[in-house]
């Protein structure tokens, strides 16, 4: 039981939701009435999101979601935060709850074999296993599993093309995929199986469940796990980390990254310095100055973030 004040719930569920548009307003009202912040995505294929609030408020929300006709029990990962990790509450209607951009991919019909965190090490240590990090390049940069391939994708939409271009690396192998909470692997494994690969596996509950359940001394995870909120990243035991965001490009930065000559708080980092013009950096510097002034006044410290 954590003594941190905010409970963070990452959830998803694939299920036919033809009535998804009508679910938006009740969810938004419940969240706002109970001080919950974060993002929930609704689509005809299900629900996905990460939210934070008091333990009691999150319990109410999960009960509401579970009671939605046709939805069933969502895949859930809980963690905790010392501060509210979101700025506002958003409930959005989408075409997909995780955007791959490939028509006809349905994890309810075909999906990879789930591997529990306690069994994951044995699978990825097998010399006949290819381990694929299903996340984006900036996520891979601060942490991944031993021996994992980085597809060097900036978005999930790029993954299908990577698979097609790298079939020879996957042929005749066990294919083990992982992502933050599991949802990207639902579609990724369904896609790969649709190409004719049979031995396709994914980490049940994702990295978050692995870091929660597998002791550090037994872990094959190196680094931190990027999360899409103001905590930026978590480590073993889902403890908050010292990774921060570059407010110019949203890349995660380790303490080592901040030693770069190209790092300036709120203005640039080594990853984005060459991508921005002097005018851009001047604009970011002015924004950062306003952030600092707001902090001194006790106003919202996330202005411009």
Swiss-Prot record:
It catalyses: uridine(34) in tRNA + AH2 + O2 = 5-hydroxyuridine(34) in tRNA + A + H2O. Belongs to the TrhO family. Keywords: Oxidoreductase, tRNA processing. GO terms for molecular function: oxidoreductase activity, acting on paired donors, with incorporation or reduction of molecular oxygen. GO terms for biological process: tRNA modification. Coiled coil: none annotated. It comes from Brucella abortus (strain S19). This is tRNA uridine(34) hydroxylase. Its EC number is 1.14.-.-. Pfam families: Rhodanese (PF00581), UPF0176_N (PF17773). Catalyzes oxygen-dependent 5-hydroxyuridine (ho5U) modification at position 34 in tRNAs. The active site is at residue 179. It comes from the Bacteria. InterPro entries: Rhodanese-like_dom (IPR001763), Rhodanese-like_dom_sf (IPR036873), TrhO (IPR020936), TRHO_N (IPR040503). The keyword tRNA processing applies. The keyword tRNA processing applies. Residues 125-219 form the Rhodanese domain.
């Amino acid at each position: 039981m954590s003594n941190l004040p905010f409970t963070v719930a990452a959830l998803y569920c694939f299920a036919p939701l033809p009535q998804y548009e009508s679910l938006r307003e009740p969810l938004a009202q419940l969240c706002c009435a109970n001080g919950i912040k974060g993002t929930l995505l609704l689509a005809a294929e299900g629900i996905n999101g990460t939210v934070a609030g008091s333990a009691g408020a999150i319990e109410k929300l999960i009960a509401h979601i579970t009671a939605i006709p046709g939805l069933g029990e969502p895949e859930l990962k809980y963690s905790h935060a010392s501060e509210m990790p979101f700025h506002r509450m958003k409930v959005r209607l989408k075409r997909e709850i995780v955007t791959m951009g490939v028509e006809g991919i349905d994890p309810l019909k075909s999906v990879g074999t789930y591997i529990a965190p306690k069994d994951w090490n044995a699978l990825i240590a097998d010399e006949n296993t290819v381990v694929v990090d299903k996340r984006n390049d900036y996520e891979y940069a601060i942490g991944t599993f031993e021996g994992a391939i980085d597809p060097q994708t900036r978005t999930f939409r790029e993954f299908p093309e990577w698979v097609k271009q790298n079939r020879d690396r996957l042929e005749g192998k066990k294919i083990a995929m992982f992502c933050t909470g599991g949802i990207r692997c639902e579609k990724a494994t369904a896609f790969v199986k649709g190409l004719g690969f049979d031995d396709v596996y994914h980490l049940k509950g994702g990295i978050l469940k692995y870091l929660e359940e597998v002791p550090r001394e037994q872990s094959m995870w190196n680094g931190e796990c990027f999360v899409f909120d103001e905590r930026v990243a978590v480590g073993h035991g889902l403890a908050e980390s010292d990774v921060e965001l570059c407010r110019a490009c949203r890349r995660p930065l380790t303490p080592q990254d901040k030693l770069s000559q190209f790092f300036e708080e709120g203005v640039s980092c080594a990853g984005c310095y060459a991508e921005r013009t002097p005018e851009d950096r001047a604009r970011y510097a002015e924004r950062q100055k306003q952030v600092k002034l707001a902090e001194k006044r006790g106003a919202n410290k996330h202005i411009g973030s």
